[in-house]
């Protein structure tokens, strides 16, 4: 088990303080995950750039796709930064280098810079996709187009770019100096601007709409409310003098969880309730869904809101016990009770998923009267998705088709008819990705196992490295289709 925390601050993650192998598993495991994220990110970017439907210009793409696109580009630049830090930490632990050892001329603050240069864009990597999801959900249940589409798209891009300029507000207490503190104070305030643009455009989408408060819509609206709380507490970090009081306290825990649970998790739940019918052909129970939402809403506020007060009363993060004289008992008990409430809400969600998948109401191809292309095919979709490539005439393409049919007095088109899958060209499967994954695992095992005999330990890594080379070479030279398909 890694005993340096998820942040692995040096020098606590170095050998003298974390002598078991947990940190090796942590650092090498993260490097493997980084390779996975990089490959998946390239796949998303290439697909979005090259394989859009006819008429699907960039400014007609769903906002969710836009946000996924921005996130993959962020990952492409963020992963190398944390990879450098992980490689240096691994070399310190396995080969005796001294990147983060102060007594030998290393600098533990260097780890904090590398970690947070990656870590703060990572926050936006986590929150931008749910922002895209609710930007697709809100119009469907407000029955009107997304207000300010270009502003929502470009504010998402701005958040991604500005996310690189705020990392050191996590480090105001390490002695950066007044100029650096002033710069990061300003950038931390400025990033609230594109975030506010999104919120006001979401509110504009709801304004005057014929709103249906289905479960997906409740989670989307809950996302907005909780993210506002998390965003406001985040802007307070920009005030360096008060941040000295907040730094590394439960106030930071409260802020982070209002953003990542009240924001990202509620947004993901909204997407699940919205697209589950498309994926499975079954509707989730609205009664259970609304119960799930309200218990989650109560539970997350009971869990995380008291942490603001605990932090401002001096309770530091990363502790497992405290003296009763501090007076933190009651709020911690309330927070723990809130966690139990959250746990109950998750049980309701899991039960809803299982029950609805087995015996839920048939969804049909378009249960929400939604505007997106995915609702023009059957639920669940066939393996080939679209039997014919749709031609996109504008944003909200299915609404355009449906409203034109109504205006002309015609029947609203149903889902695309099913065809024999053998008549549709599909990409061929490849075994090289799994081969490369296993090879990377062998390479990692060679570094992590505790065998004092070097001629047993290191050849495992060498073999793994050679297999990785073979896998990547074969994978990159594999044709996209079999020879018979050309």
What is the predicted role of each segment?
Residues 1-486:
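Membrane-embedded and interfacial regions of multi-pass energy-transducing membrane proteins
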């Amino acid at each position: 088990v890694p005993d340096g925390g998820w942040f692995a601050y040096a020098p606590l993650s170095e050998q003298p303080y974390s002598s078991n192998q947990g940190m090796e598993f942590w650092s090498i495991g993260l490097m493997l995950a980084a390779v996975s994220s990089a490959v998946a990110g390239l796949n998303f970017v290439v697909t979005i750039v090259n394989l859009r439907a006819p008429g699907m210009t960039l400014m007609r793409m769903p906002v969710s796709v836009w946000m996924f696109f921005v996130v993959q580009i962020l990952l492409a630049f963020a992963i190398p930064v944390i990879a450098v830090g992980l490689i240096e930490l691994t070399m310190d632990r396995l080969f005796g280098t001294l990147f983060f050892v102060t007594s030998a001329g290393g600098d533990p603050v260097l780890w904090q810079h590398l970690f947070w240069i990656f870590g703060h864009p990572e926050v936006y990597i986590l929150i931008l996709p749910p922002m895209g999801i609710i930007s697709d959900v809100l119009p469907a249940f407000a029955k009107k187009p997304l207000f300010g589409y270009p502003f929502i798209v470009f504010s998402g891009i701005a958040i991604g770019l500005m996310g690189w300029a705020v990392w050191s507000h996590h480090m105001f207490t390490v002695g950066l100096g007044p100029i650096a503190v002033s710069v990061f104070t300003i950038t931390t305030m400025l990033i609230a601007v594109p975030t506010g643009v999104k919120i006001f455009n979401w509110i504009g989408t709801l304004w005057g709409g014929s709103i249906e408060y289905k479960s997906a819509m409740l989670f989307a609206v809950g996302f907005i409310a909780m993210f506002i709380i998390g965003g406001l507490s985040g802007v307070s970090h920009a005030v360096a003098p008060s941040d000295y009081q907040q730094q590394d306290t439960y106030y930071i825990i409260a802020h982070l969880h209002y953003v990542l649970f009240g924001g990202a998790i509620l947004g993901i739940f909204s997407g699940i309730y919205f697209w589950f019918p498309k994926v499975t052909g079954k509707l989730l129970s609205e009664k259970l869904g609304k119960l799930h939402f309200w218990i989650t809403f109560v539970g997350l506020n009971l869990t995380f809101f008291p942490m603001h007060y605990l932090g401002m009363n001096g309770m530091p993060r990363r502790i497992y016990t405290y003296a009763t004289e501090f007076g933190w008992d009651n709020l911690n008990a309330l927070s723990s009770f809130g966690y139990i409430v959250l746990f109950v809400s998750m049980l309701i969600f899991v039960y809803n998923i299982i029950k609805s998948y087995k015996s839920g109401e048939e969804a049909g191809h378009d249960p929400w009267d939604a505007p997106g292309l995915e609702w023009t095919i059957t639920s669940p979709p066939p393996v080939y998705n679209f039997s014919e490539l749709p031609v996109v005439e504008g944003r909200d393409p299915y609404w355009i088709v449906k409203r034109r049919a109504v205006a002309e007095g015609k029947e609203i088109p149903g889902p695309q008819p099913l065809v024999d899958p053998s008549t549709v060209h599909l990409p061929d499967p490849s075994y090289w990705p799994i081969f490369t994954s296993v090879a990377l695992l062998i390479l990692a095992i060679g570094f992590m196992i505790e065998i004092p005999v070097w001629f047993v330990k290191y050849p495992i890594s060498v073999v793994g490295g050679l297999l990785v080379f073979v896998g990547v070479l074969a994978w990159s030279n594999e044709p996209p289709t079999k020879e018979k398909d050309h």
